[in-house]
From Swiss-Prot:
Keywords: Early protein. Induction: Expressed in the early phase of the viral replicative cycle. Plays a role in virus cell tropism, and may be required for efficient virus replication in macrophages. This is Protein MGF 100-3L. Belongs to the asfivirus MGF 100 family.
Length: 146
């Protein structure tokens, strides 16, 4: 069985353990690890928390605190994709807890072909999405025309 890093397949006998570790480190450096944001929701989101969320650069500055809260509270429970526009340039996976309504949000950033989330290599977005059953997709832009 070969090693799959950056799309290359080499037999285990062709690489020393040190070479394998170096190749793995290079693969990780070629990718950005996505950041997880944990938002506890009981009633209203704290103003400090809203300010922190706005600094994550996936909310448009014209989005009001109310619009951010409404987006979080009105989505169904389960797992869904968040995008900031129709081009899907910024993708986020969000998982809403069935019991307390809290959200786990992971920003998906790609460099090269690999996708690393919490240190685990999924190789592609499609492989990551296969780990969930139900998906919903929401834009992060508030469109007044709709």
């Amino acid at each position: 069985m070969g090693n799959r890093l950056n799309g290359s397949y080499l037999s285990n006998t062709d690489m020393s353990i040190e070479d394998e570790q170096n190749k793995y480190n290079e693969a990780i450096e070629d990718c950005k690890i996505c950041n997880k944001v944990y938002i506890k929701q009981s009633g209203k989101i704290d103003k400090k928390e809203l300010n922190r969320i706005k600094k994550l650069d996936f909310f448009y500055s014209q989005k009001t605190d109310y619009e951010i809260e409404r987006m979080f509270f009105n989505v169904p429970n389960g797992t869904f994709l968040l995008t900031d526009d129709a081009t899907n340039e910024n993708l986020f996976i969000a998982q809403k807890d069935l019991e307390n309504g809290s959200l786990n949000i992971a920003k998906l950033e790609f460099k090269g072909k690999a996708l690393y989330i919490d240190g685990k290599d999924y190789f592609s977005l499609e492989n990551y999405l296969k780990t969930f059953e139900d998906f919903y997709k929401y834009p992060l832009i508030y469109n007044k025309n709709e």
